[in-house]
């Protein structure tokens, strides 16, 4: 009989956040290894308290459910602590062999771990981040940091196994429980990754896709481009000019004088990919702190899958996938002047291994883990 894996987390299927892309790729690996996978994600358009079994749909061949995203204190408390919806799905499914919890809230995680142990179900975690609430309001910061600390330092070490997105997390948890390293993966057979564009050779076309917030340092790229000697265009996907200036008001003069930086606001995933395909390089820069070391950039894997090399700095274990003249350029320094110098010497095209992050490359290692 085919074993059943229940995969639960804050992913918005089929493609509304990075978590959804990761979970679907991982689920395909499990399916290739003879497992049936059931998904329970979130739906921000769903009314809170909607019966979970009535949300059932089929996504890429996977039985999928959703719970509503909370709004207000009472709903948040329920969301962070209750496991009733998950037990409802478990009780209405074939015998569950394993549960995988994706970046899960700690109280609910603890309850599900107890349930799984009592019912002889393997309980794993898929760990893709080490969140920081730095810069948030005091009460939120205390609650969030406490939740993160308990999950990362205590609960994960007691799981039956961990799927981790970075070498940093693999090294951190080694010796506590078995770990499986899976970076951000894609399905190379999907038509959306086909790239028939010819790279521009009259000017360098860059793209940044994301929401910088406190994570991506888009300001470093803007400052660097303001100093370059080459002709360029930068397409910024994910935020508007007004939103960018709310983060970096001192850049108003730079952007007023530079018409080669174009802000497109938020676009669909497929529209964003089209911009990435057309670019000579996709770009992002991050602080090399624990948050960046623990994660693995979805935009990096997706750009490579599009056939577009990446200009970035060395965070996480990105350097494992970039070699001289292939897949991109890793800038050693976070200094905008050094980034400018690198940009001035960039070739219009570079060899890219489009299949580097295809999920099929990891079928064997997942089989050993399971």
Regions found by a protein language model. Name each.
Residues 1-52, 60, 161, 223-229:
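N-terminal subdomain of nucleotide-sugar transferases
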Residues 6-8, 197-216, 221-227, 234-235, ...:
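Conserved donor-binding/catalytic core segment of Leloir-type glycosyltransferases
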Residues 14, 35-78, 96, 169-172, ...:
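N-terminal strand-loop element at the rim of the active site
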Residues 17-18, 216, 268-275, 282-301, ...:
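Nucleotide-sugar-dependent
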Residues 18, 333-340, 344-370:
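A charged, aromatic-enriched C-terminal amphipathic alpha-helix characteristic of glycosyltransferases
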Residues 25-28, 84-88, 107-110, 114, ...:
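Membrane-proximal helix-turn-helix segments that form the acceptor-binding/catalytic region
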Residues 41, 149-194, 200, 209:
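Donor nucleotide-sugar binding/catalytic pocket of nucleotide-sugar-dependent glycosyltransferases
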Residues 238, 248-274:
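Nucleotide-activated donor-binding/catalytic signature segment of Leloir-type glycosyltransferases, i.e.
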